[in-house]
Amino acid sequence: MEEGASERSKLIVNEAQNANKGGWITVPFIIGSMLGQGLALTGAMGNLVVYLIKEYNFKAVDAAQIGNIVQGCTSLAPLAGAVVSDAFFGCYPVVVFSAIVSFVSLILFTLTAAFRSLQPPPCASISDACVPSAGQLAFLYTAVGLMVVGSGGTQFNMLTFGAYQFDSVGDRDVFFNWSIVVMYAVSIIGSTSIVFVEDSISWALGFGVSAAANAIAVVLVLLGSKHYRRPAACGSPFTGLARVAVAAIRKWDVVVAEDDSKYAHGTSEFEESINLRPSQRFSFLNRAAWICHGDTRPDGSIAKPWSLCTVQQVEDFKSLLRIFPLWSASILLSVSIGIQLILTVLQALTMDRSLGPRFSIPAGSMVVSSLVSTVVSLLLLDRLILPLWQKLSPHPPRPLRRIGLGHIINTAGIAASALVERKRASIVRSHQPESQHGDWVVPMTELWLVLPLAVTGVADALHFPGQVALYFQAFPRSLKSTATGMMALIIALGFYLSAAMVDMSRRVTGWLQDDINGSKVENVYWLVAGLTLVNFGYYVLCAKLYE
């Protein structure tokens, strides 16, 4: 009770301090900072695989694995940043600190490109003299690590911080819409303009532009400081969930009766939870809320929080267990996206990237095809398909169906990548090996790679928003802000596991070699397509059980 009273008093003081702050005056500072941070992150991370191959003489598959691991870290870091903000420091200090860390990271990236002493010497074939030294790798990995830390405190925290500036749900929705537009816009701009500068002009200039964008982001977020509402840290809701598991284990031998008066309810900001009855789903957890001797004080408050939880906490934990199978079905979906993106970059490096006599499309910019497809698909869904659906049916399309359709189209996109690779490999085989020197370009335009990525982009427009909507509906009220963060965890696991799958394909099957033209990339794509098809069956089963 004392702990709860203390937290409520902190909230009251914090609300009084923030009463005359916030609103639309804060949006230019927050959105502008998001724009700068997004450009900085995309400029540094979007072309990392190519940077490792061209400037650090990494083998293609090794660079692809490192790229996937780093992408996984930058995807997982925002979830850790959100927990740190909620539990310890609040959003604003974490946002400012992380933005400064990102800036330092980009300064280090710029130095690696500007000074040849921080890179191995260039050479036509890999030899001991071409391998980067331990010091050079340490400097590079420090820059990468700082960028991961910086991304962890800015991406989702900026959304939470911005939403806190508004009282109206409508205003928050408008802010979220603009934030999503900015996120996609910076991804497209960073993956084209900054990557083009890095590939065609100078790596140092490209990283320098990213550093400048990051510096502007830091200045903007600081300039608006006097206008912000600053949410205070109120403790992590995950502690209550952990208590449920511990309490249920401790009371594994307790016999629970039908007497509702023996369940702990406590006080809650949600009035209906005071008299909430424990459900029979996962009934073995109900004993965590069963009052035993010594669990409560004379005034009825909980004396042993790791032995007794409220019914609301137990039901919150159950809701997470119920959604977990559906969440797990999305992991392989993310794995397939990670593999397709990284293999597409490796394919593009071998293909004809010229677009006219003077322009060449950077290999790292191929991801834009998927981003543009996603944006166009979202606009069509929002402005055409969903309004038409509402006219024909009184019920909006359920998230589960939207996610399921995304699964199917994603499999089609991976299969399309396999067919494009079959054509590319056949062209490689049709040319004599002696004509394939080190800089030999496959006489096939890389625009062939656009179609599979566009199909996958349509799938992303269906299953990603569908998952966010599903998690927001299914998660307990105390974890609504964490619900959208679960997507970060899915993306992170997808990149980690895709790196592991690439390594398995190289070590076990031999399908992937250092020379992509001598590899059997088509087989990898067909394997992934088959796995995603099986995973769709698993998703359908989970959806049936969930409903």
Where are these regions (language model features)?
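Hydrophobic transmembrane alpha-helices of multi-pass solute transporters/permeases
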Residues: E2-P121, C130-E547
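Beta-strand-rich luminal/extracellular ectodomains of secretory-pathway glycoproteins
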Residues: I126-S127
